[in-house]
A protein has these predicted regions:
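Metal-ion/cofactor- or nucleotide/acyl-coenzyme-handling active-site neighborhoods
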Residues: 2-35, 39-54, 67, 71-391
Length: 391
């Protein structure tokens, strides 16, 4: 019996030990934890139906606060320089209504109209008599004749022998005609025109008021001169009326070579003395220039022909003379406005300076007469840049 108890007790001990070991083994083996589920995607609720103006834009994250700005001691703070203003945009001025109307007339295709040209030339010759009366000569103004100043009709001048000897022996234009003539005005429109070569290509070139033809102007106005007018006011302003040194005047006259110099000695009584001094100076210095005097009777005829109340400008006088003397007349530098008709830029009064003209001439009215002749194909006005090969 005892041995059986011992065996039973031993078996129980053995089972107990195995149970402890098994329990320990099971407790050390842990199952892997289940995977952590990812959070569901953020779902933005759609706006309820009927919500007008509601946005489907997701709300932005709150801004990350910036660090506080560095505080600089007030003594070191310098104000920022003001911004440099940008230049204003270039504004091209528009042409005024008057210039628009003028250019509408001028822009028509120009063509020489032989019949119109011949009729007008004949009318001018029969009315103004430039061939025989444009210049005071010994042929048309004898000793004892009365010269009536065209600007002072109440002060006639009796021709003495001394005066008579200063007159041209005969009219330099009698029985002379030229095929092409350039009449060069002094308008600022000639600046940068490149018209010099075309001007000089004419057989006879007329210039006004001792206009400069030095090298700096050669490209635009040329230098050929067959006839030049000399207003006594220029002789007084530039050369002190030739009462002092006369050499500067003669140095200035060299540029005109052997041209005729047309002096309005009998327009006003004050013109006579200074015009005579100019003539005597050129004789004393043996100048090749031939001074002659404009005939006031011819100027009165011109004024009546053009029906202008104001005194005619030198430009219109010379254009009129050219229309009698020349088959083809081309005008340059004739533009009475202060804005370029094609480039829309401001113009100087003259191509060589910006001295304003006096109000004794009716420049726009004169230009209107010349523009009408341009439209009729009687003469041609050149505006803008010239093309020498087109002539």
């Amino acid at each position: 019996m005892l041995p059986s108890l011992k065996m039973l007790f031993s078996l129980m001990i053995t089972l107990l030990i195995f149970g402890i070991l098994f329990t320990t083994l099971i407790s050390d083996v842990r199952p892997a934890p289940p995977p952590v589920p990812l959070p569901p995607a953020l779902k933005i609720p759609s706006p309820p139906k009927g919500c007008k103006g509601c946005s489907d834009v997701r709300p932005s994250a709150p801004p990350v606060p910036l660090p506080p700005a560095l505080k600089i001691p007030s003594s070191d703070v310098r104000p920022a320089p003001p911004p440099v203003p940008l230049p204003p945009a270039l504004k091209i001025p528009s042409r005024g209504p008057l210039i628009e109307k003028v250019m509408a007339r001028y822009s028509q295709t120009w063509k020489k109209q032989e019949e119109n040209s011949t009729k007008f030339r004949d009318l001018l010759r029969s009315t103004c008599h430039g061939f025989t009366k444009a210049v005071v000569s010994q042929d048309n103004t004898p000793v004892g004749a009365q010269i009536v100043y065209d600007g002072e009709k109440r002060k006639p001048l009796t021709v003495t022998s001394a005066f008579f000897n200063t007159f041209a022996k005969r009219n330099p234009f009698s029985n002379k005609t030229w095929d092409t003539c350039s009449v060069v005005g002094n308008g600022g429109i000639l600046s940068n025109s490149n018209c010099g070569e075309m001007i000089d290509s004419a057989q006879f070139v007329i210039r006004c008021n001792l206009s400069p033809v030095e090298n700096s102007f050669l490209k635009d106005v040329g230098n050929k001169t067959n006839l030049v007018t000399a207003n006594p006011s220029i002789l007084i302003k530039k050369f002190r009326g030739l009462q002092d040194r006369r050499r500067p005047f003669m140095e200035s006259m060299r540029r005109y070579n052997d041209s005729l110099m047309l002096l309005p000695a009998f327009s006003y009584s004050g013109n006579t003395e200074v015009s005579l001094r100019a003539l005597y100076t050129m004789e004393d210095f043996e100048s090749p220039i031939r001074p002659v005097f404009l005939n006031p009777e011819y100027l009165l005829n011109l004024r009546s022909f053009w029906r202008l109340n104001k005194r005619l400008s030198s430009g219109l006088m010379m254009a009129s003379l050219a229309l009698e003397l020349c088959t083809n007349v081309h005008l340059y530098g004739f533009w009475p406005f202060d804005q370029h008709p094609l480039l829309h830029q401001p113009l100087k009064n003259h191509y060589y300076d910006n001295v304003q003209s006096t109000k004794i001439h009716a420049m726009p009215a004169e230009f209107d007469h010349l523009l009408r002749l341009h439209e009729q194909g009687v003469l041609k006005i050149h505006l803008g840049k010239c093309r020498p090969s087109s002539r």
